[in-house]
Amino acid sequence: MGGALSTDDPEQRASSVEELNQRLAHRFAAKCFEPLELTHLKENFFSRALDQHGIRYWNEEILSEFLGIPDGAGSAAAATSDGSLDAGPVIFRMVSYLGAFPFQNTMAPTVLTFESMVKVVVLLTERYGKVLKRGKKDRIKLLFGSLADVGRRDIITQLKEATEDSLESIGPFDPKSASPSTHNTGFLVDQPLNDEDEEDDDDLAIAALESLDAIEVFKHDQRIDKTVYESKISLTTFRRLLTLLLVTAPLRPLGRVSKFTTGLSKPSLDAVHEQVDSILAALEPGEASDGIGYKSFSKLVSTSLPYLFDPLTPLFEHLLFSKNLDLSRKRDSQTTNGLTNKPVPTPPSTPPISPPLSPVISTGGFDSRILNPAVLSHLSFFVSTNVHIPNIFRNRTHLHPVFSSTEHGESLTSFSHHVMTWQAPSILLVRGAVVSESSEEQLTTIGAYLPQPWKQTSSYSSRRSSEVPDPSTLPCLFELSPVHTVLQGSPSFSSLKPNMPVSHFSTKTGIAIGCVIPPSSRKSLGSDLHPKPAGGGSLLIDSALENATFIVSNGLNGPGVFLPPGISPVLSSTSLTASVASMSSSNQNITKSISIYNLEVWGIIPSTSLATQLDGSGSPIEKRDAISLQRAQWDFEAREAERRQAINMKVGGGEADVPTGRALLEMAGIIGDSYYSGHHRH
């Protein structure tokens, strides 16, 4: 086989590539799909496919209509007047590129045949990990190549030309042929001009071909494109994709896409556009006009938007369920004809009923002044709340309203009562205006994900220690607007000194996230008591909950809880140290003083099924959820308040003994500042 594949005959090599493409698609299908899923995929594809010369294929209109994506034409026309959701051309461009994998050099853009669709569904859903050697790293390369449109000739025109040329050149379909030829000259940018990153790209394709004994034909002439690193993604293309991803982020498996893409009000669209602008603002300034390069795209996605493309999974998994397919009719027919009496498992004719997967905002709380669907979608792109299913829209996370400065008052006593009694992870959100010399007000939204409960200062000595960083157990500090910024938690934060907790609460100095806490003593006065910034970033909020200071550092403040921006905690220890050292050389600090308008804390309640814990014998442990624990704590505090009121404060009965009695109670920790939750005054 090797001799045949290494032939110098261009036509035979092209035929070999077509054969390999067919075999690879079959391997993808066998490895990544259940038989029933493949049956539904075939039904969906062939029942809608166009036919030309015996070739069954989809065009852009069919794809957009089936997925429910607005594309400005057909029944999936733009749902918004400004066309910001018209992502049909972008998605079709992506699938036309990915359908040629791993032969983008000679086959992209490819006609969207069934074999191409099989590869597309694998690469755009969670199944990609079964076929890509380096998982997310390889997928980011493929996604960038599928989106890059700057440096290529007009993509839409080329897609149409490629489809027409391919269908016209193949002639009548020969039933004896293993597969029709859909060969074309490929994207101009994919023609090899240099060998930069050749080894990585070759490995990516070889990983897909090594089991097919097809390495020689690949190495001979079909190298993956190298000039993809010289091309760029236009801002318009990325903006449309971001808008679609933000709007469809809550999409559940088999859910209706039109529910999220139609009927959007202007305020809802404005909120989406604010988040899109924030993410785009995180790119290098020059890329706004020239396009987004591979390095910037890869850095942005891998370090601060790791779950950005998660909405594509439920979107393309629609192809794996057909409403028209009902195998129960076939079973009934077989039973009636006496062919078999053996029960045959049948797929459901309607989508199975499953609990809502979107984060549920608990009823009976406050109306948020910060959280809205767009902000929630933005958070889902980088906040991980579960090790097995990181995405908050997929792991059945519930968000519980814990504290609102608007609802509960701008008081640390009230904050303590509501937040310090919450024994579960939480998200802190702050909305306000950046204080500057300019008269123009600039709104900002910052926050922190805290995977551990808020605790008293003295409780931070017992912190988690783990060798393998799990995103759901690492804190993160972030800015949602006006510039998307994520400071990931350092995987070594558990080994930091006890005076460097993730979060710190004090009735005297306020709230501190990611700071060094000076030791308290009788000699410490004034500014000596205030927390100091540390690591890649910190957040300080004064005791009146009126002002905040947000600091982003490239290493000037030494080690800390958070890494500098643009660094991922999943790097090896050597790479992590080198990255932090290179960032530290810039010695840049960005400090924002913020006048707080709203401060909110949202508790995270994981899915009951995902939160189940087992004891030593393997039996499930009965757990009380955070809401019940908080109510129990409040009941305890109420009883303690009644008990304290019943104590005779006069001790000896005289007025002069009142201070003595109060001093004794303070030393016992029953009243006074030492009791962290205090007694809240309303």
UniProtKB/Swiss-Prot annotation:
- Recorded protein name is Restriction of telomere capping protein 5
Annotated source species:
Ajellomyces capsulatus (strain NAm1 / WU24) (Darling's disease fungus)
Name which cysteines form disulfide bonds. Answer: none
Can you tell me where the transmembrane regions are?
Answer: none
* Keyword flag Cytoplasm: yes
Q: Where is this region: Disordered?
A: 167-198, 331-358
Report keywords, A-Z. Answer: Cytoplasm
Please tell me whether the keyword Cytoplasm is annotated for this protein: yes
Q: What segments bear the compositional bias annotation Pro residues?
A: 344-358
Q: Which InterPro entries match?
A: TLDc_dom
Family stated for the protein in its record? Belongs to the RTC5 family.
Q: Where is each TLDc domain found?
A: 369-605
Supply the gene name.
RTC5
SMART domains named among the record's database cross-references = TLDc
Q: Which GO terms describe its cellular component?
A: cytoplasm
The role this protein plays is: May be involved in a process influencing telomere capping.
State the source organism's domain of life. Answer: Eukaryota
**Any matching Pfam family:** TLD
Q: Where in the cell is it found?
A: Cytoplasm
